[in-house]
C-alpha cells in the first residue's frame, strides 16, 4: 500500500491533502504563537502578583510560624513558577515554533516540486502517447490519399499511353513516402507504448512514492515538534512538580495544635501575683460598732437581709436555669458541628463551619460567666443564710441602747433622737420594699453583669445588619431607639434614635477596648446602652438625645446564623450564592446570601425582597422563613422548593408535559399575581426563570428583588441597571412606569415561554431588535401546538396601551375556564 501503487489517478486528492496539511500547520503555528503569548502573560501576571503582595505580610514575625513560612514559600515558589513559565515560553518560541515555520516553507517547496514534476512528466507522456501519434496518423491518412491518387493517375496514363513513366515515378514516390511514414508510425507507436508503460509503472509511482516519503518525513518532523511542544508545555515536568511539592510540603508543615507554641515561648510572661481583695479596715476607724467581713444583723437591717436573701435565692435559681439552657445549647451545637464536619466534601469546607465554631466558643464563654455568677450568688447566699440562721427566732438587737442614752440627755433630746432613728428606719424600709433597690450597689453590679453576659444579638433592641432606611421607618416617637450593624461598614455598630422630630444615627466608638459615645466607656455594647437607658444620660452633649423606648425586633422573622446549617451550593443569584440549608428542627430551606462587598444600594435591594415577602402568604408565592441580619453576611431564608426553576423544568421535561399541565402552571402564576395585585405589589421581573416548581408541580412565584409595593399601584423608576427587556412592557422601558398592567405584559411573555416549552422569547432577535420590533407593532406568533384560546390571551396581554390589558382577575377566570374544557 502506497501512493505509487494506489494513487496513480488521484492527483487532485494528493493536492487537496497537501493544501489541508499546510492549513493545519498554519493553524498549529498560530496556536503555538498564542500559547507563547499566553504563557508569557501568565508568567508576567504571576510575577506581578508576587510583586504586589504586601511585603510586610511575607516578613517573618518574631516567632517561628509555620503559617508564615508556608505563605512565604508559596510566594517564592510562585515566583519560581513564573520564571519556569517564562523560560518555557522562550524555549517554545526558539524550538517548536521556529522549526514549524521552517517546516511550513519546506512543505510548500515539496508541493511546488511535486506539482512541477508531475506537470512535466504528464506533458511528456501526453506528447509521446497522443500528440505525436495523432500527427503521424494524420500524415498517414494524407499519404494514403496521395498514394491512391497517384495509382489512379498511373492507371489513366497506361490507358491513354501518355507519360506512363512519369506517372509511375509519382506512384512509386507516394508509395515510398507512405511506407516510410508507416515505419515511423510503427516505431513511434512502440515508443509510446513503452513510454506509457514506463509512466504508469515507474515514473509516476516513483514521483508519488517520493511525495509519500517526503510527507512521512514531514509527519515525523511534526511529531518531533509536537513531542517537544508537549515536553515544554507539560505541567507535570519535574521542575513544575517540584514547585507544587514544595508548596504542599510547606502546607503539610502547618499544625494548628503547635502553631502558637513558639509564640507562647517568645511572649510568655510571668504570672503576676494577684492582689488579694480584702476589707478596707480604714473604713472602720471612725466607727467601732461595725466589724470587717461580718454581716450586721439588727433592728435596722433584719428585714432587708431577708429580702436580700430571697432575691439572691431567686437570682441563683435563674442563673442555674440559664446555665442548664446554655450547657444544653453547647452540647447541641457541638453535635451539629460534628455532623456537619462529616459531610464536608472538600478540605476548604471547614471554612463553612467557622461561624458555628465561633458561636460555640462564645457559648462556652457565656457558660463560664454564668458559672462565675452562680458561684458568687451561692457564696453571698451562704453568708446571708449563716447570719440569718444564727439569729433564727431571736429579736434583732437595737442599733443604739436608748435607755442608757436617756440618762445623759433630756426628754426633748430623746424625742429628737428617736425621731431621727425612726426616719432612718422608715427610709430603709422604703428601700426594702423596692426590689430594684435591694442589695444597693451590689445589685446594680449584678444587673450590669447579667446584661454583659447576654450576647448583643439576644437583645431585643439589636436589629442586626438592617438598612438605615428600614431602621428609620421603625423609629416614630420621641426617644425610640435601636442598635444595628452598619450596612456599609460591617463590624461597625450604630445607635439610631428618634429625637426632636428627626432620626439621628450615632456611631458607637470603640477605643482602647471600650465602647462609648463621648462619656464613660464599657466593655460591651449592651452595658453601654443599658447605662444610657437607665441613667437617662444624654448620648452627646451637643445632641441632647436621651434613650426612652427600645424598639424590639420582629422576632417572628429573625433567625440567628447559628440556627441555619449551610449545605450544597444550589446556584448563584444577583446578590450572592444560594445554598441548600437546614434549620435546627431539620426543616430543609433555601438560603440566599448577600456578598459583603456589594455596594450599599444593592444590599438594601437584597433585603427589600424579604421585607416584601413578610407580608404575603399564598400557595403560589414562595414563602419567607426568616432573615439572619445579626451579622454579616446577611441571609434570607426561604422555603426550599424542590423542583427548581420553571424555565429549566420546562426544557428538561418538554417531552413529558401535557397541555393540561401547562394550563395548570399558567393558572398557578395567574393566582399568585392576582394575590399580589390585591396587595398593590408590582413584581417587575415576572418570567419563567423566576418561578419555582414545588411539590405536586405547584408553581410558585419567587425572586422579588426588583419588586415594589406602592399604594397607588404605580411605580416610577429612573432606571434599572439590568432590565429584562424581552419581558418588560413598552411603557416601563420608555418611561420607567411600572404597574400591575406592566406585570400583565410580562405574564403574556411567561405564557409564551410555557407553551413553547422554554424557548427564549423573540427567537433570533437581540434585546434591542426585539424592543424596536415591538414598538413597530410586531408581536410573536403562537408557539407550536398552542391552543388558540391561550394565544388570544397572550395577544390581550401585549396590547400597547396598558389600560386595554386584562386584569389578573380576568386572566384567572379565563384560564380556569380553559382548564375545565381540557380533559
UniProtKB/Swiss-Prot annotation:
Name the record gives this protein: Tyrosine-protein kinase Fer
Binding site for ATP: 570-578, 592
UniProt-listed SUPFAM superfamilies: BAR/IMD domain-like, Protein kinase-like (PK-like), SH2 domain
Active-site residue numbers: 685
Phosphoserine modification, residue list: 434
Post-translational modification: Autophosphorylated.
Catalytic activity: L-tyrosyl-[protein] + ATP = O-phospho-L-tyrosyl-[protein] + ADP + H(+)
UniProt feature coiled coil, ranges: 123-185, 301-382
Record-listed Phosphotyrosine modification sites: 402, 616, 715
Residue stretches making up the Protein kinase domain: 564-815
F-BAR domain boundaries: 1-259
Occurrences of domain SH2 (ranges): 461-551
GO cellular component: actin cytoskeleton; adherens junction; cell cortex; cell junction; chromatin; cytoplasm; cytoplasmic side of plasma membrane; cytosol
Amino acid at each position: 500500500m502506497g501512493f505509487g501503487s494506489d494513487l496513480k489517478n488521484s492527483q487532485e486528492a494528493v493536492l487537496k491533502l497537501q493544501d489541508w496539511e499546510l492549513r493545519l500547520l498554519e493553524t498549529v503555528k498560530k496556536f503555538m504563537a498564542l500559547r507563547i503569548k499566553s504563557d508569557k502573560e501568565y508568567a508576567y501576571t504571576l510575577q506581578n502578583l508576587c510583586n504586589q503582595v504586601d511585603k510586610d505580610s511575607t516578613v517573618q514575625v518574631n516567632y517561628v510560624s509555620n503559617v508564615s513560612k508556608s505563605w512565604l514559600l508559596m510566594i517564592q515558589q510562585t515566583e519560581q513558577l513564573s520564571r519556569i513559565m517564562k523560560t518555557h515560553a522562550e524555549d517554545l518560541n526558539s524550538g517548536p515554533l521556529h522549526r514549524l515555520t521552517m517546516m511550513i516553507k519546506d512543505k510548500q517547496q515539496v508541493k511546488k516540486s511535486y506539482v512541477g514534476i508531475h506537470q512535466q512528466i504528464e506533458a511528456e507522456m501526453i506528447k509521446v502517447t497522443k500528440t505525436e501519434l495523432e500527427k503521424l496518423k494524420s500524415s498517414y491518412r494524407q499519404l494514403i490519399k496521395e498514394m491512391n491518387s497517384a495509382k489512379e493517375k498511373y492507371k489513366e496514363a497506361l490507358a491513354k499511353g501518355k507519360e506512363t513513366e512519369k506517372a509511375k515515378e509519382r506512384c512509386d514516390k507516394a508509395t515510398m513516402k507512405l511506407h516510410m511514414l508507416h515505419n515511423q508510425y510503427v516505431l513511434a507507436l512502440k515508443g509510446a507504448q513503452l513510454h506509457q508503460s514506463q509512466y504508469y509503472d515507474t515514473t509516476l509511482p516513483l514521483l508519488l512514492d517520493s511525495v509519500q516519503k517526503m510527507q512521512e518525513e514531514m509527519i515525523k518532523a511534526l511529531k518531533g515538534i509536537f513531542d517537544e511542544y508537549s515536553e515544554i508545555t507539560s505541567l507535570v515536568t519535574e521542575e513544575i512538580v517540584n514547585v507544587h511539592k514544595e508548596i504542599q510540603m510547606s502546607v503539610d508543615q502547618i499544625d494548628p495544635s503547635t502553631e502558637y507554641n513558639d509564640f507562647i515561648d517568645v511572649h510568655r510572661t510571668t504570672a503576676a501575683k494577684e492582689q488579694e481583695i480584702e476589707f478596707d479596715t480604714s473604713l472602720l476607724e471612725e466607727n467601732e460598732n461595725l466589724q470587717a467581713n461580718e454581716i450586721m444583723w439588727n433592728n435596722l437591717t433584719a428585714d432587708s437581709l431577708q429580702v436580700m436573701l430571697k432575691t439572691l435565692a431567686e437570682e441563683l435559681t435563674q442563673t442555674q436555669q440559664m446555665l442548664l439552657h446554655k450547657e444544653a445549647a453547647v452540647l447541641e451545637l457541638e453535635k451539629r458541628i460534628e455532623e456537619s464536619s462529616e459531610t464536608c466534601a472538600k478540605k476548604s469546607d471547614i471554612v463553612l463551619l467557622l461561624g458555628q465554631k465561633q458561636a460555640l466558643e462564645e457559648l462556652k464563654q457565656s457558660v463560664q460567666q454564668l458559672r462565675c455568677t452562680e458561684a458568687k450568688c451561692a457564696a453571698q447566699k451562704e453568708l446571708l443564710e449563716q447570719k440569718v440562721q444564727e439569729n433564727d427566732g431571736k429579736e434583732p438587737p437595737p442599733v443604739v441602747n436608748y435607755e442608757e442614752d436617756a440618762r445623759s440627755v433630756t426628754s426633748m433630746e430623746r424625742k429628737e433622737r428617736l425621731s431621727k432613728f425612726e426616719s432612718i428606719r422608715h427610709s430603709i424600709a422604703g428601700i426594702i420594699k423596692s426590689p430594684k433597690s435591694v442589695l444597693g450597689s451590689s445589685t446594680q453590679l449584678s444587673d450590669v453583669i447579667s446584661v454583659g453576659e447576654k450576647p448583643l444579638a439576644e437583645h431585643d433592641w439589636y436589629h442586626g445588619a438592617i438598612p438605615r432606611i428600614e431602621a428609620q421607618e421603625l423609629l416614630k416617637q420621641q426617644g425610640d431607639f435601636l442598635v444595628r450593624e452598619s450596612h456599609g461598614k460591617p463590624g461597625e455598630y450604630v445607635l439610631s434614635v428618634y429625637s426632636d422630630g428627626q432620626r439621628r444615627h450615632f456611631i458607637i466608638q470603640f477605643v482602647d477596648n471600650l465602647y462609648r459615645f463621648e462619656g464613660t466607656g464599657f466593655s460591651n455594647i449592651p452595658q453601654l446602652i443599658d447605662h444610657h437607658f437607665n441613667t437617662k444620660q444624654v448620648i452627646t452633649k451637643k445632641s441632647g438625645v436621651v434613650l426612652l423606648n427600645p424598639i424590639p425586633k420582629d422576632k417572628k422573622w429573625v433567625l440567628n446564623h447559628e440556627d441555619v446549617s449551610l449545605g450544597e451550593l444550589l446556584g448563584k443569584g444577583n446578590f450572592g450564592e444560594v445554598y441548600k440549608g437546614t434549620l435546627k428542627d431539620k426543616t430543609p430551606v433555601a438560603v440566599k446570601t448577600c456578598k459583603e462587598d456589594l455596594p450599599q444600594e444593592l444590599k438594601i435591594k437584597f433585603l427589600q425582597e424579604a421585607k416584601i415577602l413578610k407580608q404575603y402568604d399564598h400557595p403560589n408565592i414562595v414563602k419567607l422563613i426568616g432573615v439572619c441580619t445579626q451579622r454579616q453576611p446577611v441571609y434570607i431564608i426561604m422555603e426550599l422548593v424542590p423542583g427548581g426553576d420553571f424555565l429549566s423544568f420546562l426544557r428538561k421535561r418538554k417531552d413529558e408535559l401535557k397541555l393540561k399541565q401547562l394550563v395548570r402552571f399558567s393558572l398557578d402564576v395567574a393566582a399568585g399575581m392576582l394575590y399580589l395585585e390585591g396587595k398593590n405589589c408590582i413584581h417587575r421581573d415576572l418570567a419563567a426563570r423566576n418561578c419555582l416548581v414545588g411539590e405536586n408541580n405547584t408553581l410558585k412565584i419567587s425572586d422579588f428583588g426588583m419588586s415594589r409595593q406602592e399604594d397607588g399601584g404605580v411605580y416610577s423608576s429612573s432606571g434599572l441597571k439590568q432590565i429584562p427587556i424581552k419581558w418588560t412592557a413598552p411603557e416601563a422601558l420608555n418611561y420607567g412606569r411600572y404597574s400591575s398592567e406592566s406585570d400583565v405584559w410580562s405574564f403574556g411573555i411567561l405564557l409564551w415561554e410555557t407553551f413553547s416549552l422554554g424557548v427564549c422569547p423573540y427567537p433570533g432577535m437581540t434585546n434591542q431588535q426585539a424592543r424596536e420590533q415591538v414598538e413597530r407593532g410586531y408581536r410573536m406568533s403562537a408557539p407550536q401546538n398552542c391552543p388558540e384560546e391561550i394565544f388570544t390571551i397572550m395577544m390581550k396581554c401585549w396590547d400597547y396601551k396598558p389600560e386595554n390589558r386584562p386584569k389578573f382577575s380576568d386572566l384567572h377566570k379565563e384560564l380556569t375556564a380553559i382548564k375545565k374544557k381540557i380533559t
